[in-house]
Each structure stands twice: as structure tokens, then as C-alpha cells.
Amino acid sequence: MKREYQDAGGSGGDMGSSKDKMMAAAAGAGEQEEEDVDELLAALGYKVRSSDMADVAQKLEQLEMAMGMGGVGGAGATADDGFVSHLATDTVHYNPSDLSSWVESMLSELNAPPAPLPPATPAPRLASTSSTVTSGAAAGAGYFDLPPAVDSSSSTYALKPIPSPVAAPSADPSTDSAREPKRMRTGGGSTSSSSSSSSSMDGGRTRSSVVEAAPPATQASAAANGPAVPVVVVDTQEAGIRLVHALLACAEAVQQENFSAAEALVKQIPMLASSQGGAMRKVAAYFGEALARRVYRFRPPPDSSLLDAAFADLLHAHFYESCPYLKFAHFTANQAILEAFAGCRRVHVVDFGIKQGMQWPALLQALALRPGGPPSFRLTGVGPPQPDETDALQQVGWKLAQFAHTIRVDFQYRGLVAATLADLEPFMLQPEGDDTDDEPEVIAVNSVFELHRLLAQPGALEKVLGTVRAVRPRIVTVVEQEANHNSGTFLDRFTESLHYYSTMFDSLEGAGAGSGQSTDASPAAAGGTDQVMSEVYLGRQICNVVACEGAERTERHETLGQWRSRLGGSGFAPVHLGSNAYKQASTLLALFAGGDGYRVEEKDGCLTLGWHTRPLIATSAWRVAAAAAP
């Protein structure tokens, strides 16, 4: 059947004098219509009124979507011919200059129902939280660069062996029949998947989002007659829910040693993470890498080479600059040490992890400004051996000695090389050639993010605390991550670390946005070099927490309550840090870019620093209990 378009202004029969009146009226209407016609489109031969522009644009967009769904990807011309069969060569559309009517006629042809698909055996439903399947030939044509195709009918991909509590049940497809169709951008090839719903709890509020998809018959036919269909993501919220569910389901599969199911989920995680932005995408990428290392049993190597040792120091320095966590740790510990040294003429600090010595210039300067003059200051720095046998600890001592000389502080330094703190003995920390006629040294022991590493070796922490107790320090300052990554099952540890590092990455994003850094396209320019390197610094911790076990897993963080129990059981009593340290720490954060999101809290005499409502690090001070003193 041919469709003809009749001009509204066409001629009729001979009507005598009435004809002249009608022509005059038509001429007047034509002049009015000519005034309303868009001039730019009229120059191209199309008659479109300015008032009809919005309607024509909407119809063109619908036409483009309908024709674009015809399989412009790897299916080739065959899919196009089958889907747009109503636009055959024998169909004629007259007068395309009247663009509105012409587009409407095209849409009427496209909206005709297609031929029914042949019946096929229904594909198995997935027990996973994700209702997506990866494509083969059309991979990479849509939003994501998709991984290799995974056969959804295989027992590996069907996650039935995992009775995950975090998996969202699939909804009945019949409930979606009355729902209005949504605009979806897809990869190449026809799109179909089962309809599913997911929900997440955010502060006690349940949020749900739904994926619109074709009925199961279409999915079964596509699985039987063509390549696997691409992923269809309606919005980033739905993809984010799927991403979290995939991470948790993969961790549960690892715990159950169902590595075939875990491998299938590991392949989904990068695809789902690529739809996210900001901190969530970065955290998911690091956790996905850590899970992949655990599934494929590819453990991260220890920092044994010269390059790794130098890189670790570089990451630590960038982490110090990008966020206030290390600054807070150094400041609160120094404040406690300064108060303990009040009125003392000879002081000695033992630093269990001196690294680049960034903590001590501030304390030296505070002692130099003390009324009555600075005391004699001795510093013992402990550090690991260097792969190239260089004396890096001595180089740190030279720099600190030069600084102390400029502010006129009597300074002595000694470096102790130890592969682990458990190798230290009490005599190594005692004063050399101590003159009994002089005032005795007052000792302070400082540990920033060091004690948790000892938990990987049975009995190591108890030995180190016994060594500390033997030298009778006036104060012991301890800074540790406020997290529990050292107890429970692997899934519990994974879930806790996912929450912890998500908050940590959020704080980095907030600090970077508050500092007004460059918005160039490159990652280093967009987030700043310090922020990018700090993310790598945290990513290495994530990899150790998730991918490693046994003695290799050194990032065994524990909460403040757990450290209070350990130190109290080893003969130490807590020292209240006081309100002065709290006020000064709050002032320090106010000066830091993006400090609005950071929160300092005082908890049982200890200070914590967190992002919004989540504490992330904690500083505590201790002394040898009277009953435990030798």
C-alpha cells in the first residue's frame, strides 16, 4: 500500500466568484503561514512552523531511537532489515518538505508490531544480584568496555551455590508489563534481560531502583539464536547497588571457596564500577583488584626491592600532604609528649616508625619556645633495613640535626635498623654512658600506625610492650586506624574494610574539592598529584587486607576499644589527653582545605578524627601502671 500526502493548500474545482474569495482568504492565510515558517529550515526546503519545532524535534528523536534499536552493532544489515521491515523499498512517503507530517508517517510505519519471535527454551534465571549478561560481538559498543562473554547458562555463572543474604530477589516479569518504557542507551545488538529490582539501606532508609527489560521470552530467544546481550544500566544508582552486591557476593563466594562463582563475579565488578564516578568507582576498582588477586592466588609481593621501598616512602609523603590524618596523628602525639616533658631538662623520644622524620620538627620548635629554654633532646629512630644497604635513617638524622641547630636545640640522634619491632631489646633503648650525677632522662615512646603490624606474628605485640615497659617511659603515644580488620570471618573483614575505605576515599574527594584543584581531564590534574598518590597508598592497604593471609597480612587494624584491652592487659594505664589538645586539633582542622567534613571527637580521654560521623583514626596516650612498674 502506498501512502500519499495531500497538500492542504491544493486546488479544487471551478467555483466561480466564490473561488476568488477563497483564494484571497487562502492567500492571506498563506502569508501568515509564511511568516511562521522557520527561515533556516525553509532555506533547506522544509516547511516547519516555529510553533511546531518542539513537536518535530520530539518526533525526530523518537524516530532516531526506533531506528537505532534496529541493531547497528555487530549484527549487521540482517538485523536492520528484520527490525525496520516496515520501511521497505515499495513504501513511498510523498512531500518530505512538510517535515512534521513526513516524520509522523515514518513513525506510524515503525510502530507497527513486528513479526512474533519463534519459541525457545527459557534461559535459566540467575541467582545473583545482577540481572545482566555480557555480550560477545557487540562488546564495548555502549557505555562500557565489556569483558569477554560469559555463558549465562553455565553452572559457574548461575550463582545458585551462593545463598547470599545480600542478593536481591528477582521480581516477577509480569509486574513490569504496565510500566512505561524508559529511554535506554545500549551496546550493539538487540537488548534483553530479565527484570530485577535491588534495594540498599542508607541510614535506615530503603532505596529501590528497577531495570526495565524485555520479557523472558525475548531473553530466551536471544540466548538461543544470537550472541549474549549487552548490559543495560538504567541509572547510576541501580548500577551502584549492583556493584556493592557484586562485591559482597564475591567475598562470600571466596569465603565459601566457591572460586568458579567468585571468578564470574570478579569479571562483572570492573564493568559495573566503570558506570560510577568519584570515590565509589575508585574504591570498587581497588577492592575488585584485591578480590581478583585472591581468586587467582596472585599475592602482592612484599616491598623488598629498592624501587618498592622508595615508592612506599613517596606514597607516605603524599598522604601526609593530601589529607589531615597524619598531621592530626603527629600533632596530638606531640602535644601529649610536650605536656609530659614539662619541666624536664633531658628528654628522650623513641620513634617506632620514623620514616622521613616529619613529626619531629614541630616538637623541636615547641621545645625551643618553652619558657626557661629548650631541654637536651635525644631521638632514637627505628626503621627497616634498606634493600640497597644505604643508611637512610642516618640521612633523616642529619636533616633533623641541621634543623635543631638553626633553632638552637641541643640535639642527639641514633638510628636503629630492625626488620620488625619484635627484634628490639630494652638495652637498645637505654641511654648510652648515662651519668648518674646528671638529671635522668625522661623517655617517651611514640608509635604511629605501627603496632597493628605486630599482630601478624603471634606473641610479637606482647614482647614489644614488655620491652617498652622495661625502659619505664613517662608516656607512650599510640595512633591507629579506628577499624576492625583483624577478627571475624573473611566476609566480615571485607564488609568492614569496604565501609572504612569508602569513607576514607570520600574524605579525599571532599578535601580535593574544597582545595579548588585543577579540573583538567587527566586524573593527576583532576584530583591533584597528592590525592592520586594517596589513593594508591590506601589501595595498597586494601590489597593487603583482602588479598593476603597469614604473616603476609600485616594491615590488621583494630578499634580503640580493642587496643585499650590489649594495652591494659600488658600493664599500661590510660593518660587523658585533655581538652587543650582537643581545641588545638579542632583549630588545625579549620585551617585545612575541606575541613568542614572532618570531625574531632573526644572519647574516654582519647581523640578521634573522622569524616562526618565515621571515626577513622584514634590517638591514645598511656603510662606504665604502678602495679606493673619494676
UniProtKB/Swiss-Prot annotation:
Result for mutant: residue 255 to H: In strain: cv. MO24W
Residue ranges of the region described as Leucine repeat II (LRII): 395-427
Chain residue ranges for the region called PFYRE: 443-544
Annotated effect of mutating residue 486 to D: In strain: cv. KUI43
Region (SAW) residue spans: 547-623
Chief localization: nucleus
Protein's name according to its UniProt entry: DELLA protein DWARF8
Function: Probable transcriptional regulator that acts as a repressor of the gibberellin (GA) signaling pathway. Probably acts by participating in large multiprotein complexes that repress transcription of GA-inducible genes. Upon GA application, it is degraded by the proteasome, allowing the GA signaling pathway.
Every GRAS domain range: 234-623
Biotechnology: This gene, also known as the 'green revolution gene' has been introduced by conventional breeding procedures into several cultivars. It produces shorter plants, increase grain yield at the expense of straw biomass, and are more resistant to damage by wind and rain.
Low complexity composition-biased segments: 165-176, 191-222
Motif DELLA motif: where in chain: 38-42
Presence of keyword Transferase: no
A Gene Ontology term for the protein's cellular component: nucleus
